[in-house]
């Protein structure tokens, strides 16, 4: 039973994140990266608060934990800005698989900070994903600045990987419901103040709001489903299934957005996805 539950929750997370990234592309094309970030994250924030009200879990924080929560929130903000800005200038079918490579960062941090040992398949996964990053960066007649979207995606991958590494510690130090909600409260505050500092106008056409709301619901839905899955089943099982969400995105982008990518970039995407599977085993 736990295995079947893990498969179900892993699939829900995979579908949620895959469709979320697809809709994000359409939202950014219409509302811009910053407004998409604000309204989509605000939606997920509201959903997480409702979830916390239904399943309340409190914890007494220390100064050290508060500092870690603030660092995590800053990294999440950085990750989203880089991710969404990358989508503005590059195909989502290239950006999303790169960002999904964040497990590499988690494992590297685990090695250097927690002194965890690499397995053979993890080393192979590193090589595959680095090769994939090189391949998706290849463009015919590339000009200076042409790879800005790829650089943004790599920045997002590093930020999200570091944030999730810290989040893993915070879950163990508190509990996953409190860590999820409190982290989102801090991130929402940072997003609001950052956009206020940048003097970003938040007004958007009403026709765009359904896209922004759907992104937020799918993103938080995937996060909650993943968290449930790893609590009732094998972490490796849920991680492998959910990590394949770029497959959904790439298929949708190819069918509906008609994104054009080179054969080298296609091979790079496949190599990154293969590395994702290996690194999650």
Model segments located where?
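Selected transmembrane alpha-helices and immediately adjacent juxtamembrane segments
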Residues: 3, 147-181, 213
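Hydrophobic transmembrane alpha-helices of multi-pass small-molecule transport proteins
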Residues: 48, 108-111, 121-138, 264-281
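Membrane-interface interhelical linkers
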Residues: 1-19, 24-34, 39-71, 80-90, ...
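Hydrophobic/aromatic residues within transmembrane alpha-helices
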Residues: 27, 36, 86, 98, ...
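Helix-coil boundary and interhelical linker segments in multi-pass alpha-helical membrane proteins
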Residues: 1-6, 53-64, 109-122, 169-176, ...
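Residues that define the loop-to-transmembrane-helix transition and helix capping
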Residues: 34-35, 93, 119-121, 177-178, ...
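Alpha-helical transmembrane segments of compact multi-pass small-molecule transporters, enriched
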Residues: 43-47, 98-112, 186-190, 222-225, ...
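Hydrophobic/small/kink-forming positions within alpha-helical transmembrane segments
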Residues: 18, 22, 49, 73-78, ...
């Amino acid at each position: 039973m736990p295995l079947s539950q893990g498969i179900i929750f892993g699939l829900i997370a995979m579908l949620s994140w895959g469709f979320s990234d697809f809709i994000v592309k359409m939202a950014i094309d219409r509302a811009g990266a910053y407004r998409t970030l604000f309204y989509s994250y605000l939606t997920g924030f509201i959903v997480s608060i409702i979830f916390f009200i239904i399943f309340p879990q409190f914890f007494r924080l220390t100064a050290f934990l508060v500092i870690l929560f603030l660092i995590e929130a800053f990294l999440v903000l950085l990750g989203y800005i880089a991710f969404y800005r990358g989508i503005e200038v590059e195909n989502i079918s290239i950006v999303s698989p790169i960002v999904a490579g964040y497990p590499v960062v988690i494992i590297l941090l685990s090695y250097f900070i927690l002194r965890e040992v690499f397995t053979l398949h993890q080393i192979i996964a590193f090589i595959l994903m680095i090769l994939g990053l090189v391949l998706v960066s290849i463009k015919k007649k590339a000009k200076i600045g042409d790879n800005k979207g790829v650089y943004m995606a790599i920045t997002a991958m590093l930020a999200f990987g570091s944030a999730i590494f810290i989040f893993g510690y915070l879950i163990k130090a508190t509990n996953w419901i409190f860590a999820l909600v409190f982290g989102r409260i801090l991130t929402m505050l940072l997003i609001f103040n950052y956009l206020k500092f940048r003097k970003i106008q938040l007004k958007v056409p009403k026709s765009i709001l359904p896209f922004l709301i759907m992104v937020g619901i799918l993103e938080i839905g995937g996060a909650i489903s993943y968290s449930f899955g790893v609590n009732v089943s094998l972490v490796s099982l849920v991680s492998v299934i959910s990590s394949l969400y770029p497959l959904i995105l790439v298929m949708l982008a190819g069918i509906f957005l008609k994104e054009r990518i080179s054969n080298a970039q296609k091979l790079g995407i496949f190599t990154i996805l293969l590395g994702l599977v290996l690194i999650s085993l």
